[in-house]
């Protein structure tokens, strides 16, 4: 339960244990679950954390940006993972600055960070290294199934992106 001392939507699993690795690598990997964090730490990715609760919030991002300006979200490649990534991305738009680098990676084949890092830590490292920048993720998501040679699709794209651009400080 939440209280005056504990606000779940602002806490991150593994942050205390990750601080040294985050400082050394100047990067934070954010995953969806606690078991992912445990496996990643065991497999050499001590700079990983997970949000407590059900979703990543602006409060989480504000806290993490104190430790590194390089944030990598790592989600499952399924529909739920893409939805979680979109929500995280929109939360990031209000907080990013010129010196902030946010990127998104997705694990395919029905695996999660726990499984992939246990089976092949180098493959997990590649997933993180090949992350999409926030802008690439944003544009790829909005342009999916659109043809900008068609005026109707240009209109859809413009209507979709303008509210997001307005979130950026």
Residue ranges and their predicted role:
Residues 23, 54-109, 115-121:
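Conserved catalytic cores of soluble enzyme domains
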Residues 19, 65, 89, 162-166:
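Generic hydrophobic alpha-helical scaffold/packing signal
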Residues 3-10, 52, 56, 76-84, ...:
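Catalytic cores of large soluble enzymes that bind and process phosphate-bearing ligands
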Residues 99-169:
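C-terminal or mid-to-C-terminal helical accessory/interaction module adjacent to the motor/catalytic core
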Residues 1-67, 71, 84-85:
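Phosphate-handling DNA/RNA-contact segment within nucleic-acid enzymes
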Residues 1, 6, 13-16, 34, ...:
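Aromatic side chains
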């Amino acid at each position: 339960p939440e209280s005056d001392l504990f606000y779940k939507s602002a806490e991150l699993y593994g942050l205390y244990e990750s601080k040294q690795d985050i400082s050394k690598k100047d990067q934070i990997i954010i995953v969806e679950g606690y078991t992912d964090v445990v496996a990643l730490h065991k497999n050499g990715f001590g700079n990983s954390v997970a949000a407590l609760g059900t979703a990543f919030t602006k409060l989480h991002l504000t806290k993490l940006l104190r430790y590194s300006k390089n944030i990598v979200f790592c989600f499952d490649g399924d529909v739920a993972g893409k939805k979680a990534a979109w929500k995280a991305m929109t939360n990031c738009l209000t907080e990013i600055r010129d010196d902030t680098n946010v990127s998104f990676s997705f694990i395919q084949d029905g695996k999660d960070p726990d499984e992939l890092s246990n089976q092949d830590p180098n493959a997990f490292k590649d997933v993180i290294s090949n992350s999409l920048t926030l802008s690439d993720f944003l544009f790829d998501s909005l342009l999916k199934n659109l043809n900008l040679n068609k005026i109707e699709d240009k209109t859809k794209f413009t209507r979709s992106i303008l509210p997001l651009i307005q979130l950026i400080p």
